[in-house]
């Protein structure tokens, strides 16, 4: 019987469904090992030829006069190309795997690639571009009323974040860097975030719309997520506290995102800064992972298993094995995710210095309770203590304990973690249905959980009746 073989690939998502780009990747029925190798070699040759063509074609093509901007004070397409190609480590526009942006009659385009302008008719669940737009400063000034404080929605290590409205009506988040931040390390993080975001596309990852690097202005334009971050929800700053079913759904969304980064991209991507404040929440209480300034791509060299690098991350979330060896792997993200699971269950921050000394490290405190069969005592005081919620708390805490083991080799992969979370979800649903059958008035948690079932984003190869990701 013929076997199925495939080339691992990033998946493109539209309306919650994953699609494959048939122009570059395809499923192939293979009858023998020799045929599989031939198909693999042929695919590699085609991709290499395509890359060479793009580099030569885009590198030599000249702009027509009508394709240049006429707006005063705005950079030309040639300037934009120079900015992009002038970056250290990114020698040409094709370094992004994308093409250089041009603007003609108000419509954004890319040479040699498909592009859909993010107009008012475009669905928020669809990716509206195939690469980053290089904005002009004038465009971003108009979008934010000259960076008015009225439009300011946040501030962080990068700088100030504004809510903006592009010329075509698209609402975006505009991250403007602090000018006194500029240094070699910071500039690397700025460029790294753009480079990483330009290579990924997933419903549970914040989308990159574009950027600006002109003079002393450094700006990143990303998808606007309207409902704050997970930490704000756990602190009760965003209205009603999250119920257990909603917390589980958010954990699954983050697991989806990390599984994609580790498994389905061309080269595995390690986020390196998974924490509650980097998990943005939509109005439908779905999660999107943000902030890729620290992200790293694992080498494409055969056999590469880690990156030797300076330690980066947030206190309380950093993998102790990474701290000890300076070797970064995807299991470092797994450790951070385990800390995040504990944070979701308890509502506490990873480190709380105002608590008694033995309870200051939230993970250690929670795992002591688990060892004493007292998992219910770690639950956020605002969570309802029904049967389903208590069972989920214990199962998620056991899963978190696997993620935060000191030795990375014993930690599960994100793919397996996602499978276990789906199993917990199915069991919770069954418990709720059984409870509601004997009690005509279901809890609000039951309603919120079942009601979200039809609205969830799908992870590739995971369905309610499946036990694994293939």
UniProtKB/Swiss-Prot annotation:
Instruction: Return the Gene3D superfamilies for the record.
Output: Phosphorylase Kinase, domain 1, Transferase(Phosphotransferase) domain 1
An annotated GO BP: response to cold
Which amino acid positions bind ATP, per UniProt?
A: 153-161, 175
Q: What class of enzyme is it?
A: transferase
Q: Where is the composition biased (Polar residues)?
A: 83-98, 108-121
Annotated catalysed reactions: L-seryl-[protein] + ATP = O-phospho-L-seryl-[protein] + ADP + H(+); L-threonyl-[protein] + ATP = O-phospho-L-threonyl-[protein] + ADP + H(+)
* Domain Protein kinase as annotated: residue spans: 147-423
Which InterPro entries has this protein been placed in? Kinase-like_dom_sf, Prot_kinase_dom, Protein_kinase_ATP_BS, Ser/Thr_kinase_AS
Which parts of the sequence carry Phosphotyrosine? 322
In short, the EC number is 2.7.11.1
Induction and repression of expression: By cold, salt, abscisic acid (ABA) and hydrogen peroxide.
The subcellular localization recorded is:
Cytoplasm
Instruction: Enumerate the active-site residues.
Output: 273
Positions bearing Phosphothreonine:
309
Q: Where is this region: CaM-binding?
A: 162-185
Q: Name one GO cellular component term.
A: cytoplasm
What family does the database annotate?
A: Belongs to the protein kinase superfamily. Ser/Thr protein kinase family.
This chain's protein is named Calmodulin-binding receptor-like cytoplasmic kinase 1
Native species = Arabidopsis thaliana
């Amino acid at each position: 019987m013929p076997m199925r073989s495939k080339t691992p690939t990033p998946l493109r998502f539209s309306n919650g469904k994953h699609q494959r780009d048939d122009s570059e990747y395809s499923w192939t029925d293979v009858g023998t090992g020799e045929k599989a190798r031939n198909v693999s070699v042929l695919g590699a040759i085609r991709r290499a030829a395509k890359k060479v063509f793009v580099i030569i074609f885009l590198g030599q093509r000249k702009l027509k006069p009508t394709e240049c901007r006429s707006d005063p004070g705005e950079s030309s397409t040639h300037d934009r190309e120079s900015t992009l190609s002038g970056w250290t480590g990114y020698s040409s526009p094709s370094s992004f795997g994308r093409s250089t942006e041009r603007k003609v009659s108000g419509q954004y385009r890319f040479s040699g690639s498909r592009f859909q302008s993010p107009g008012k008719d475009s669905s928020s669940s669809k990716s509206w571009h195939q690469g980053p737009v290089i904005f002009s400063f004038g465009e971003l000034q108009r979008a934010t009323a000259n960076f008015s404080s009225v439009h300011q929605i946040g501030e962080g290590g990068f700088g100030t974040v504004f809510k903006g409205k592009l010329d075509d009506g698209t609402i975006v988040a505009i991250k403007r860097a602090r000018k006194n931040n500029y240094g070699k390390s910071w500039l690397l993080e700025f460029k790294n975030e753009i480079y990483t975001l330009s290579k990924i596309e997933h419903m549970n990852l914040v989308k990159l719309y574009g950027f600006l690097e002109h003079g002393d202005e450094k700006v990143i334009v990303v998808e606007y997520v309207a409902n704050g971050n997970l930490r704000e929800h756990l602190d009760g700053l965003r209205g009603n506290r999250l119920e257990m079913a909603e917390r589980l759904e958010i954990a699954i969304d983050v697991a989806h995102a990390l599984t994609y980064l580790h498994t389905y991209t061309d080269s595995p991507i390690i986020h390196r800064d998974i924490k509650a404040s980097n998990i943005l929440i939509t109005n439908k209480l779905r999660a999107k992972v943000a902030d890729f300034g620290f992200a790293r791509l694992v080498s494409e060299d055969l056999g590469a298993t880690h990156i030797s690098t300076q330690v980066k991350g947030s206190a309380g979330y950093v993998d102790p094995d990474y701290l000890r060896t300076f070797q970064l792997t995807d299991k470092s993200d797994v450790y951070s995710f385990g800390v995040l699971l504990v944070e979701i269950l308890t509502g506490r921050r990873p480190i709380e210095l105002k608590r008694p000394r033995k309870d200051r490290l939230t993970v250690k405190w929670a795992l002591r309770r688990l060892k004493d069969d007292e998992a219910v005592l770690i639950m956020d005081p605002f969570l309802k203590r029904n049967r389903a919620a208590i069972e989920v708390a214990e199962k998620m805490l056991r899963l978190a304990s696997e993620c935060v083991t000191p030795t990375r080799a014993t930690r599960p992969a994100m793919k397996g973690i996602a499978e276990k979370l789906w199993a917990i979800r199915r069991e919770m649903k069954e418990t709720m249905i059984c409870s509601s059958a004997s009690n005509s008035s279901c809890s609000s948690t039951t309603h919120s959980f079942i009601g979200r079932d039809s609205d969830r984003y799908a992870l590739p190869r995971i369905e309610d009746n499946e036990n694994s990701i293939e």
